[in-house]
Structures are given as C-alpha cells and as structure tokens.
C-alpha cells in the first residue's frame, strides 16, 4: 500500500513511518503542505495522512486544494486538535476520517484499511468475537444478529477493545481514546462505562461474557468460552 504522509513534526513522522512500514506499507513523507499538494497531484497513493499544523500552510488548505484539483485519494487527518468543530471542518473540506493524536498503531492501521476498502468499494470492516459483531464503518454492534444500542462513549470503548482483541487495555488508554487528553475525568469513569457496556451486552448475550477484568491492569476483550457458547 502506498501512503503519502504530510507531517512537519519529525519525531511524530518517524513514529508513524515505523508503524506503517512494520505493516509493509510504502511511505512517502513531506513536512510541507505545498510539496504534499504537488505529490498528491502527481502520483497515485492509496491514502494520504495529513497533519493540520504545517509550517507553510494550513492542513485545511492542503485538503481543500487537493479536492478542488479533483484528487480523489482518500485523506485521513491526524491532528492534536480534538475539538468537534475541528473534526466537522476537516470532514466538511473532504477528509474521509479524522483521528486525534496520540493514537495506537492498531487503530491507525485498522482505520487506514477501512478507508481504503470504502474508497475501492469493498465490503464494510467487521470484527467478530464469538456472536459479537462490531461494524467499524457503520459503527453498529450486534450480538447473535440482535442490535445493541450503545452511547457514543460505550461504542468507542467497545471499538477499541475489538481493535485490540486479546490485549489488556489500561484505564489510561481508554481515557486517552475517549477524551484525547482534553478535560479528562477521573479514571473511575472507565469502570462505570465498562459496567454499563457489560450490562447491555449481557442483556442480549445471556451467559456469554466478552469483557474480562484483568485486576490491577485493565480490561480485555476475549472470545467467549467455546463450551459455554455451545450450551447457551
């Protein structure tokens, strides 16, 4: 996969390059918006990763110029600005998605794949854990074919658990995912969200348990016990 990264912070750019190259992506990097526009026009990329705070011009201007130039390459904004108005503006200018820094490698890779699939008309991205199905594109959750209605925060937590299935996630990781370092509440709010999320899943799944507590560390999403699934 060919990726154009437009990012002026050399440390962040190097970190993202390492993330992508570990997945065998071909990454082309520039720290200037003007050069990013030229590269985006001249060459074919599967996706463009765009920072908003560039030294020569705004990332929004890069995005707007590319779209006015009929460049249809999918664009994922990677920004430290977590405000709703920033996200709405970016999507309004033609971005395909918006991720707030910092982010985890697994989520970045999953979102890139989902965006590229959509751009090529492929099927929606779905993560299945037992009878639990999380649709990353439609942002819906089902258990045994029955829709589970979650709040925005509950869905974000389940999405992160699904993306990192089998990996223990700390409460700090959840807080960062939910709030992006902005006005974060106390850690105990994560326990409250997990409790509500479990109740909603249990109401549909019955005896199946998906979210496991790892005492002193955090939470993990695991496949439900096979024997329990068969007896349910």
Curated annotation (Swiss-Prot):
Keywords: Cytoplasm, DNA-binding, Phosphoprotein, Transcription, Transcription regulation, Two-component regulatory system. One of its GO terms (cellular component) is protein-DNA complex. The keyword Transcription applies. Residues 2-116 form the Response regulatory domain. It holds the Pfam family Trans_reg_C. One of its GO terms (molecular function) is transcription cis-regulatory region binding. It is found in: Cytoplasm. The modification 4-aspartylphosphate is found at residue 51. It comes from the Bacteria. The keyword Transferase does not apply. One of its GO terms (biological process) is regulation of DNA-templated transcription. Residues 124-223 bind DNA. PANTHER family: REGULATOR OF RPOS. Essential protein that plays a role in the control of cell division, possibly through the transcriptional regulation of ccrM, rpoD, pleC, minC and ftsZ genes. This is Cell cycle response regulator CtrA. It comes from Brucella anthropi (strain ATCC 49188 / DSM 6882 / CCUG 24695 / JCM 21032 / LMG 3331 / NBRC 15819 / NCTC 12168 / Alc 37) (Ochrobactrum anthropi).
């Amino acid at each position: 996969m060919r990726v154009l990264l437009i990012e002026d912070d050399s440390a962040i750019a190097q970190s993202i390059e390492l993330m992508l190259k570990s997945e065998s992506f071909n990454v082309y990097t520039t720290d200037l918006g003007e050069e990013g526009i030229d590269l985006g026009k001249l060459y074919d990329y599967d996706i463009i990763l765009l920072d908003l705070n560039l030294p020569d011009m705004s990332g929004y201007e890069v995005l707007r110029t590319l779209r006015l130039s009929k460049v249809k390459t999918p664009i994922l904004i990677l920004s430290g600005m977590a405000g709703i108005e920033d996200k709405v503006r970016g999507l309004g200018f033609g971005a395909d998605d918006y991720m707030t820094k910092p982010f985890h490698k697994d989520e970045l890779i999953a979102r890139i794949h989902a965006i590229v699939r959509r751009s090529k008309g492929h099927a929606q991205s779905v993560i299945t854990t037992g009878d639990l199905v999380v649709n990353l594109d439609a942002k819906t959750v089902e258990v045994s074919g029955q829709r589970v209605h979650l709040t925005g925060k509950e869905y974000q937590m389940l999405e992160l658990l699904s993306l990192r299935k089998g990996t223990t996630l700390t409460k700090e990781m959840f807080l960062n995912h939910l709030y992006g370092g902005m006005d974060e509440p106390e850690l105990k709010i994560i326990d409250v969200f997990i409790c509500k999320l479990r109740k909603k899943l249990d109401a549909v799944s019955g005896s199946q348990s998906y979210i496991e507590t790892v005492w002193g560390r955090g939470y993990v999403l695991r496949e439900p016990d096979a024997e329990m699934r068969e007896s349910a």
